[in-house]
Amino acid sequence: MSGHSKWATTKHKKAAIDAKRAKAFAKYIKGIEVAARMGGADTSGNPALELAVSKAKKNSVPNDNIDRAIKRGAGLTGETIDYTEILYEARGPQGTALYIECLTDNKNRAASEVRVAVTRHGGTMADSGSVAYLFERKGVVEVAKTDGLTEDDVLMAVLDAGADEVLDESDVFEVVSEATDLPAIRAALDEAGLEYNNDDPQFRATMTVDLDAEGARKFLKLADAVEELDDVQNVYSNANIPADVMAQLEDDE
């Protein structure tokens, strides 16, 4: 799940921990399978696979699962896995836009499930290009907030590596850069000894839409329903849930 931090913060509080963990595991496993299919099972000769495995390990995916994913992706088990990346566009309540990133081995299934989830929860599918222009591809790295670490500390570590900005987002600092600068950002953080996660290219909204309480409730139900689909890797949005509205949502629980 990806979007404005106010959405992310609320979403984390509302989501079931076990469900999030299972979804995250599936995402990392798919990433490993795709990288192994493209470049083979040897991490030393396949940088994309090495990175995918590193991310999975950082997020506590068991080694057995990782090994099986590498073998499946590389075709060493006799299985054939052919994933396709697809982007769907949708509209939500109060002018919100959703950019839905899927990785699937069945395009018809993915399209059908996304359409059903969107329409059943008050959204509408959008024509190609009618939502995409609201987003830009960025590199985003989440740096863990350790004792004493400040926003300025992170900025100083990554400034010369091409970082556009560092954002203070509740329990992490977000380093935002051009997607092509991600390797340099990772290297700079490693050199500074700073722990980081979720170092991926993401679609970021160029402008956000503020939601009131009713709109936020509808939006979260819609985003949750789409994000829970097996083929969905990420849901990006221009939705912003202001602090006072977020407080109302927390009172609902």
UniProtKB/Swiss-Prot annotation:
Subcellular location(s) per record: Cytoplasm
Principal cellular location given in the protein's record: cytoplasm
Short name of any one Pfam family annotated for the protein: Transcrip_reg
Keywords: Cytoplasm, DNA-binding, Transcription, Transcription regulation
Database matches in SUPFAM superfamilies: YebC-like
An example molecular function term from Gene Ontology annotations: DNA binding
One GO CC term on file: cytosol
Domain of life according to the entry: Bacteria
A GO biological-process term: regulation of DNA-templated transcription
Family from the record: Belongs to the TACO1 family.
Protein name as annotated: Probable transcriptional regulatory protein KRH_13670
Taxonomic source organism: Kocuria rhizophila (strain ATCC 9341 / DSM 348 / NBRC 103217 / DC2201)
